[in-house]
Amino acid sequence: MNEPVNIRLLGPGTRVALLDGATVEIVSNPLDGVWLFARYLTSPDDPARVGSEEMIFAQDVVEIQGGP
């Protein structure tokens, strides 16, 4: 089991993996500890999401994959 990710530390450009297997790039972080705004880079369950921007719930973030 992975350690929880502290999303307050994540800035724009950081790539993270989500619970559903998708990968997103953070666009902005309101620093509320609950939400991130991110762009989908991959989405195995719904390829139509790739390129779209959505709010991501903190509990859906499972791993930091890289970034600035």
Report each predicted region and the residues it spans.
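Intrinsically disordered, low-complexity, charged/polar segments
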Residues: 1-2, 43-68
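Acidic surface patches and DE-rich sequence motifs
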Residues: 18, 30, 40
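SH3/SH3-like beta-barrel fold
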Residues: 36-42
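Mixed-charge, Lys/Arg-rich low-complexity intrinsically disordered regions
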Residues: 1-16
